[in-house]
C-alpha cells in the first residue's frame, strides 16, 4: 500500500503541461509563473486541478525549488490558485473574470463592390495572367541561393532597369536604375517620401479637389494640408503661393488631374518647378493612369522637365491589376540615401520573385502588348458611359470625357441643392465616389467620379442609363442650365 501511495504521489507531482525555460534568462520564477498563468487562463489547467508540489515541479523542470515557490506565490496573488493546508496547491475552482480588452472602434475600411462605377478596377486579361504565372514559376523554380536571402531595399535591379527603360521611352523621364525604388503602391511610396523628407506639421500643397487616398496618407502622417484650387490648366500655383508660399512640398497629378481629368499646362508646370526651387520644396508627382492615353502623343511627365525637385510616383496597379501591389518611385540622386533608409526601416526590402517575373514580361514586350490590347477596350468603355449618360440624362449632367485615364467626371448644375448627388446615386443603385468626397473646401457643384475600367460594356450601359434617368428625375428641367 505504501509503495502504491508513493507511486500516486509521484504521478501527482508531474505537470501535464510542457514548460520550456530559457536558461539564459535569470528570472526562471517569472518564466514558470507566466507559463502556468497562461495554462490556467487558456483552460489547459482545469479548475480544481492539483498542481505538483514545489519540490516535484522543481525536479521536473530542473530548477531551484525557491523559483517554484515564488511562482506559486505569484499565482496565489493573482487569484489563479489556492493553497489547501496539508493537501497542496490547486487551480482555483472559481477563476477571476478575464480582463477582456474593450473592442476597438470599428475601422472605416471599406472595399467597394466590383460593379460600375467603382474606381481601381481593371479588365482581367487571361493572356497576361498565363504569361505572368509562367514567369513566376520559372523564377521560383530556378532561384539561386542569393535570391532567397535578404535583398536590396530598392527592389529588384532587373525590374528597376526595365522601369527606367519604360519611363525614358514613354514618359520622358531619364533616370538611372539606382534612383528607382520598387514599392507596394502609390500610397506606400508617398509614405516613404513623407518619412524621409518631411517633419510632422510641415505644410504641403494639395490639389482641391484631389485624390482622397493620398490626402489620407499625408494627413495621417502629420502633414498640414494646404488646399490649392484647380482650374482648366491644373493646379493654380499663384493661389498656392498666396495661401502658403513657404510650403515644404506639393502633391500633384499633372498629366491627368484627379478627379477633373485636366492636364497641367506647360506654363503652370514651369511655375510650379520655379516655386519648388525658390521655396526649397519637393514635388510629389503622382503619374497614375498615364499608360492609357486615347488621343495625341503621351504627355511628358513633370519629372522629365525638371526633375531635381520632383519625386515621381508610378504604379502597375492600373496597367495590370491592383492586387499585384507593385509600384515605383523615381528619386533625385541627392535624396536616394534618405528614402532608401526610410524603406529599410519600414520593411527592409520588397519580395523579389514577382518583381523579376514582371520584369521578364516587360523585357519580352508582353506588358507593352497588353497595354495595346487594353487601350481600345477602355476607350470603348469610356464612350459607352458618355453616350448612355448623354442619352438618358438629357442634359441634366455635364460630362468631361477624358483623353486619358480610367474614369470620367459628371457634374451637376450649379443650382442643384446640396445632397442631390447622393440622392441620385442611391436611386440609381450605382457604386461611385462623389466629387464632394474629393474636396477639402466645398465649393462648386457636386458630381460623380465614374470608373469605367474593369466592367463589361452592357453593365456600364445599364448603370449609366440608371444614373442618367435618376439625374433627370431628381433634377428636373428647372435645375438644368438653359
Residue ranges and their predicted role:
Residues 145-280, 291-292, 297-305, 309-311, ...:
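Conserved core of the PLP fold type I
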Residues 209-212, 436-440:
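Short, polar loop motifs at secondary-structure junctions
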Residues 309, 432-433, 438:
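Flexible, Gly/Pro-enriched loop and linker segments at secondary-structure and domain junctions
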